[in-house]
Amino acid sequence: MSLSRLHIESFRNISSAQLQPGDGLNLIYGHNGSGKTSILEAIYFLGMGRSFRSHLSQRVIKNDDDALTLFANMESGDEQSKIGLRRFRSGDIEVKINGDKVKRLSTLAETLPIQVITPESFSLLFEGPKSRRQFIDWGAFHSDPRFYAAWVNVRRILKQRNQLLRDGSPYSSIQFWDKEFIRYAELVTDIRKQYVDSLNELLKGIIGEFLPQVDVKVSFTRGWDAKTEYAQLLETQYPRDLATGYTVSGPHKADLRLRVGTLPAQDALSRGQLKLLVCALRIAQGKLLKQQIDKKSIYLVDDLPSELDAKHRKLLLQQLADTGAQVFVTAIEPAAIVDSLITPPSKMFHVEQGRVTVIE
């Protein structure tokens, strides 16, 4: 999957921009505040329906404009398609794929798989299990068509179950919901575990490239005792759930554990090593997607020179090239990226005050 044309309108400080990216690495450079990161953000928004920089979508709409508009032509092998999105300041959103209206944002994610490596993405190892569940679920969503519906049902029933607990309902009332909840919870858990097992096979070699002197162990924890049946646990744990007002254990507590020896990776590794570990995780995820469903991710890499030294920049860029994916990289100075590449970028763009110029 790659973008052959990108149109951005009323997004952050970009009034209007047209890009024709290359299939390989696209270098976007400019001063801080020029709008180069906004291009990455716009691509992400087109694939996810939201920003990776702000939870408030209204903030990305330029000045007093009523809406932002994003459009792209996509290519995957011999197949070509079009995707368009308009987000209004009111919160409404319109999405079209090949001219047909799309109701679910999950269809965007399925159509345009995106991986992000930004200064903020390193929080994967620090912000608690939620971000790591999202990491797992990205892969589970793309690898197994059953996952999304099961995940939606888990969230729906969990919300209902927690409300019953807050209302002080007897277990007989909650048990009615538990039968369905258990079925979906176990399916979500099985798909997650299968995905992490597959990821691990690729990850070992990639971590070895980035951190050859470090033995990192990656494991999946499902959110409750592996030796206990979930149905039994929900029943025996009812008094505790009732006291707390929410379901203490379950797939909503799943996690991806990364350890070095007996220590969590975030305690055993330096900040620089942790950055490399996150890069390895993202690279492995993209490679596994290609392996499982023959679809390439699009990589968005923001402010790479400030995050990695020259040696590791070169290593990351080579690993990205090996995926065969389309890559968008930002930098203040182009030399910081160009000097780390074996071959020149497919395309170079300069951004200044929201205006984008292609560099021939």
Swiss-Prot record:
- GO cellular component terms listed in the entry, alphabetical order: cytoplasm
Could you tell me the superkingdom of the organism this chain comes from?
A: Bacteria
Q: Where does ATP bind?
A: 30-37
Quote the function comment for this protein. Answer: The RecF protein is involved in DNA metabolism; it is required for DNA replication and normal SOS inducibility. RecF binds preferentially to single-stranded, linear DNA. It also seems to bind ATP.
Q: Where does this protein have coiled-coil stretches?
A: none
Give yes or no: UniProt keyword Transmembrane helix: no
- GO terms assigned for molecular function: ATP binding; single-stranded DNA binding
Q: Where is the signal peptide?
A: none
Q: Which Pfam families match?
A: SMC_N
Q: What is this protein called?
A: DNA replication and repair protein RecF
BP term (GO), one:
DNA synthesis involved in DNA repair
Q: Which family does it belong to?
A: Belongs to the RecF family.
Q: What is the lineage of its organism?
A: Bacteria, Pseudomonadati, Pseudomonadota, Gammaproteobacteria, Alteromonadales
The cross-references to HAMAP family, in alphabetical order and at most eight, read: RecF
Compartments where located: Cytoplasm
What keywords were assigned to this record? Answer: ATP-binding, Cytoplasm, DNA damage, DNA repair, DNA replication, DNA-binding, Nucleotide-binding, SOS response
Q: Does the keyword DNA repair apply?
A: yes
